Amino acid sequence: MAIKKRNKIRLPSGSPEEVGIDGSAHKPMQQIKPLVSNDSEDDDNDICVLQPIKFKKVPKRDITFDGEQAIKEDNSHYEDLYHSKKNTNASTRNKDDLLILNMEDLMEGNHHLLSDSSEAGSSSEGEHISSIPTRGEIAKLKAQKSLSRRKISESDVTTERDYVKLLDSEDKREIMETIRLNGGLKRNNEKEITNFSDDEMQGFQDEMLALTDNQIAIQKDSKRKIIEKAINEVPYRTNEEWETQLLSKGNINKSNEKIITPLPVLFPDDDESGNSIERINEMVSKICLQRKKVEMRLQALEKTKIDLEKSKASLINKLIGN
């Protein structure tokens, strides 16, 4: 890095008044000569070379408080956690020391391989081989398996529990997923539907979704007609004779119910004239009383009919709303 000097500008030494009197301000300014030379030798001498920074190692100081002594940490217990390279090299085994055993070979009389390998191996290898089952243990395991197979064969019926015991967690998860997609588990109170054809399902298909107000009104009217048709088809009006008999009493059911037939003129005798009039009056009063009773019953029936029609309309509206 070359450092160059700046050019200095020399100002006139005289006062500004003298400069104005002498008229030096009107003189042309001379060019200022540079004071620094452009020689390459001077530039090389002016280059400053930065020295590398060096840091000194300072020992770590242990900070101790008043009345306390510095305690050195014992890191010996960490050595047990990490094995050295010497220990790892000693623990490694050669590929020739490994021995592959077959259960059938052991049963056929090749058990002498175990003894040879145990004699040739180290103490650690001997511990590993000692965990291999003996001939008696192998025979015992085979006997237990044969007993379990015999129990299954005696039943001749494989239950779902026996099948599930052979499955792992992934198979069980897949089975539960397929059950969930097919409608879930079947309850005991559900009825079994067999031979259910597609033609029978046509009545249960969903209708087109009504989006506009006009479509909603048309759908409600169609539902109302279907419900009213189903209600009218119910044969609950089987015993209507009592109603006709009730209306026929007192000439209420006839067209000329307000017209009373005139009675014939009787020629009363001297003795029986009073008794006959009283009988006629009693009969007329009984008929009028009976007629009033029938009219009251008819009014009550009409009132109940109106209430039933109102409840029917409200029930239809609820069914359409749902």
Curated annotation (Swiss-Prot):
Additional notes on this entry: Present with 892 molecules/cell in log phase SD medium.
InterPro entries assigned: Ntr2
One GO term (biological process): spliceosomal complex disassembly
Ranges of biased composition (kind: Low complexity): 115-132
Annotated spans, Disordered: 1-30, 113-137
Protein's UniProt name: Pre-mRNA-splicing factor NTR2
Keyword Secreted: no
GO cellular component term, pick one: endoplasmic reticulum
Pfam family, one: NTR2
Positions where Phosphoserine occurs in the chain: 40, 153, 197
Location of this chain's protein in the cell: Cytoplasm; Nucleus
Summary of the function given for this chain in its UniProt record: Involved in pre-mRNA splicing and spliceosome disassembly. Promotes release of excised lariat intron from the spliceosome by acting as a receptor for PRP43. This targeting of PRP43 leads to disassembly of the spliceosome with the separation of the U2, U5, U6 snRNPs and the NTC complex.
Assembly with partners or alone: Component of the NTR complex (NTC-related complex), composed of NTR1, NTR2 and PRP43. Interacts with CLF1, NTR1 and PRP43.
Keyword Cytoplasm in annotation: yes
Species assigned in the record: Saccharomyces cerevisiae (strain ATCC 204508 / S288c)
